[in-house]
Amino acid sequence: MAVGVFDSGLGGLTVLSAIAARMPDLPLVYLGDNAHTPYGVRDADDIFDLTCAGVERLWAEGCDLVILACNTASAAALKRMQETWLPKDKRVLGVFVPMIEALTERRWGDNSPPREVAVKHVALFATPATVASRAFQRELAFRAIGVDVEAQPCGGVVDAIEMGDEILAEALVTSHVEALLRRMPHPEAAILGCTHYPLVQAAFQKALGPQVTVYSQPNLVAESLEDYLGRHPEMLGAGNVSRFLTTGDPERVSGKATQFLRHPIRFESA
């Protein structure tokens, strides 16, 4: 009954932690592609190939349902995977869906015409690849009208977080927020469009100010997954053991993950 969680590095651990807190009896298999992180600077074909390889590894662990806990993979690869590659008995879900649902206050299956929503000015902070894909703007346009989205590619933030350099990460966040505010001085909401960013959410909130509502993905994704599994229990795979896998050096990744989440995590080689 295991569910797979895939990310290019360690950011997806924020999503896994939220899922585990909400569904403590659900076995989860995490795969971090630390050998190839970060994805945010790669081209779409490269991201597609790496993501498919990661998802196939999780299928081998008995995970028929895999969460792409990586916005770059969700933006650059998911649609193509679902249309051209995915077997009928498997599911791959991205992390954009719950965020769009929360922002537009409508369920993903609601295919009614786009309508006005309360929030009119949205700041999007994401990796360069996610911003370049325009996937967030595209999905939002299907569901809402009259929403102005200003996107800021946040180069360097993921690298700083993966290195454990909180001071550098927070300084970069401040710089990126200031750059966006020069173009959109008064956003009403901010989307943290990378699963690494919840670890520096306080820095985003401080730089944006208390008047801006910051949407962060882990809890939204966990809530959405619980709802999905309630409607599709057949998608629980045969796996029954929680594991942490990495394409990188397990010892090094374990140390960084432990620092990342502030509790011990032991990774194995994928």
Curated annotation (Swiss-Prot):
Function (record text): Provides the (R)-glutamate required for cell wall biosynthesis.
Keywords (A to Z) from UniProt: Cell shape, Cell wall biogenesis/degradation, Isomerase, Peptidoglycan synthesis
Protein name: Glutamate racemase
Enzyme active site: 70, 194
Species of provenance: Paracoccus denitrificans (strain Pd 1222)
Catalysed transformations (reactions): L-glutamate = D-glutamate
Pathway terms, separated by semicolons: Cell wall biogenesis; peptidoglycan biosynthesis
GO molecular function: glutamate racemase activity
InterPro entries: Asp/Glu/hydantoin_racemase, Asp/Glu_race, Asp/Glu_racemase_AS_1, Glu_race
E.C. no: 5.1.1.3
GO biological process: cell wall organization; peptidoglycan biosynthetic process; regulation of cell shape
Enzyme class: isomerase
Gene this protein is translated from: murI
PANTHER family the UniProt entry points to: GLUTAMATE RACEMASE
Binding residue positions for substrate: 7-8, 39-40, 71-72, 195-196
Entries under PROSITE patterns matching the protein: ASP_GLU_RACEMASE_1 (PS00923)
Domain of life: Bacteria
Classification via Gene3D superfamilies: 3.40.50.1860
Pfam families, per the entry: Asp_Glu_race (PF01177)
Similarity comment: Belongs to the aspartate/glutamate racemases family.
